[in-house]
Amino acid sequence: IIVASREEGSGTRDAFQELVMRDALITENAILQQSNGALRTTVANTPNAIAYLSFGYLDKSVKVLPLDGVEATEENASNGTYPVVRPLNMLTNGEPQGVVKAFLDFILGPEGQAIVRAEGYIPVK
């Protein structure tokens, strides 16, 4: 088995370490990649390779494996049955106003959430 991973300091790697690996370390022999796209390409082009990847980077070039018998679907991630999900947060300095509020209203509205889904991510609403 060829292990592929994101580089140290990657948010994707940090989430995988925390949620899956816990105190175990990723092998020193792992092929390290600087982006999720490069990680996907490595798995797609390397026989016997395995890696972890953000939902939005999944495509038909790689096979997504179930965890604990649960498929990695939008529904399973949203309802909490898929065991590896990481929330992301939006932060502002104080109460959002002006263009910041307009952006948040847009991205959380129907049109913005449709864009989120079209990009391969899971909408929050």
Can you name each region flagged by the protein language model?
Residues 1-125:
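Exported/periplasmic ABC-transporter solute-binding proteins
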